[in-house]
């Protein structure tokens, strides 16, 4: 009987977890075909999955940008999972499904810029403040988040499209084992090739190396990586942190000694599981997340 009850509880928990991973709704990033669309398949239509909390006391939202080396979008472990983590803690979360190879720059970046503008314009609809919208990127998604943080603008007031009137600048960024640089000595070769092609334009390499574009106006950052990462070198994170320090941008940095690439939330990988506790504390200190109920 005890074994049966245990199995029943396990099955119920599995069903509940599956139910929680279904977004409340999905938004199209563009009203029609995306600029430069190569077809009409799902991969040609950028979308945003919406995860809303039961209550949002700090009126905060986060655009979650999964990784995948610009060749795929790791939408479960680096998309739905962190979105649920945020929603469970009273923060609205939005998972971006952006275009990847064969699409190249500027498509993935443009999709994220448009998503930020779209969400900021819908802040009241989703119960968050337009000045409390962050971006959380993993791996190549971290590169996109870092570009949003460094090359954003305040909107295009003259545009006939009202979505373009809003800023695409995140109010804070969370960078998890991110690609930061497109320079060959630091960057992730596959991400660079998928985004810029086999023979990248040096001007695009320079433009998309985020470490060279931070200013005092760049948003606060939380950066997490591991020293052992043999896919995206930890130097990427260190370059971004050093650039934040030079520019006077608030930054919190955690590098664990051991851990492979792509650990996502690392819930079952001690001591790496501590990184989300550190993130939670950082968000609470900055009033982007309410303190946990005692």
Please report, for each region that a protein language model flagged, where it lies by residue:
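Catalytic nucleophile-loop/oxyanion-hole region of alpha/beta-hydrolase
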Residues: 74-76, 80-81, 94-130, 267-272
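Short beta-strand element of the alpha/beta-hydrolase
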Residues: 58-67
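Active-site glycine-rich loops that stabilize anionic/oxyanionic intermediates
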Residues: 66-71, 227
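A domain-start/cap signature at the N-terminus of enzymes
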Residues: 20-51, 190-191, 271, 275-277, ...
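Short beta-strand/loop motif that positions the catalytic acidic residue
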Residues: 223-225, 229
């Amino acid at each position: 009987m005890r074994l049966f009850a245990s199995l029943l509880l396990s099955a119920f928990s599995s069903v509940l977890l599956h139910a929680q991973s279904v977004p409340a709704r999905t938004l199209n990033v563009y009203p029609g075909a995306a600029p430069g669309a190569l077809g009409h398949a799902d991969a040609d239509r950028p979308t945003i999955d919406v995860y809303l909390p039961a209550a949002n006391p700090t009126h905060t939202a986060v655009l979650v940008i999964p990784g995948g080396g610009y060749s795929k979008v790791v939408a479960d472990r680096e998309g739905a999972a962190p979105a649920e983590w945020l929603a469970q803690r009273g923060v609205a979360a939005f998972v971006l499904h952006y275009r990847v190879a064969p699409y190249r720059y500027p498509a993935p970046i443009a999709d994220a810029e448009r998503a930020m503008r779209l969400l900021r314009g819908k802040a009241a609809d989703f119960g968050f403040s337009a000045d409390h919208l962050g971006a959380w990127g993993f791996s190549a998604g971290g590169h996109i988040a870092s570009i949003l943080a460094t090359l954003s603008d305040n909107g295009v007031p003259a545009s006939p499209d009202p979505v373009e009137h809003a800023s695409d600048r995140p109010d804070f960024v969370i960078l998890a084992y991110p690609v930061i640089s497109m320079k060959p000595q630091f960057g992730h070769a596959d991400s660079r090739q998928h985004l810029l092609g086999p023979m990248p334009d040096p001007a695009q390499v320079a433009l998309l190396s985020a470490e060279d574009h931070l200013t005092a106006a760049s948003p606060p950052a939380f950066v997490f990586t591991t020293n052992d990462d043999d896919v995206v070198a930890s130097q990427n994170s260190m370059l971004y942190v050093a650039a934040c320090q030079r520019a006077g941008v608030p930054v919190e940095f955690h590098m664990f000694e051991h851990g492979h690439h792509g650990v996502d939330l690392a819930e079952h990988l001690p001591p790496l599981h501590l990184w989300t506790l550190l993130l939670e504390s950082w968000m609470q200190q900055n009033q982007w997340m309410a303190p946990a109920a005692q």
